[in-house]
Amino acid sequence: MPVAAPKLGPRAAQVCLAVTSQLPSAIRDLPARKVTAGPEQNAAYGEPPITVQCGGPQPAMCATLAGGAGCVPLDTELLLMNDVCWYAAPGTRANVFTTMDREVAVRVTVPSTYAQAAQWANEFSDTVVETDPSRTTGVPSGCRA
């Protein structure tokens, strides 16, 4: 399963290794799949694959409502699920969920063939809480309960 594996700094690599080492061997009825790049920062489940990528760019809240690459529009509703704040970027082929409140960003891509995409992303929240520390600064106000 091809998944991008950007070069990580030492701290991000340490956090991502902690995240991936604690991921389950299956989520619901979807078994883990082998990834071809960066198994210490990536994972995949099922067919079509739900992917988990650790260490990508951290999206930022932007002063524009239009958004853009790496930019979360100010009027976006963030999802607080199991103590993790997720930004959900809907797409026609997949929904992409990215943590907004963690030291290292974790992105979960859920193909549109799966119903209730947020619930699939939430399958990884407990692992994120246990392995990826909360950021102390720069957390969007929408991430607070």
Label the model's feature ranges.
Residues P59, A63-A145:
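Extracytosolic low-complexity repeat regions of secreted or lipid-anchored proteins
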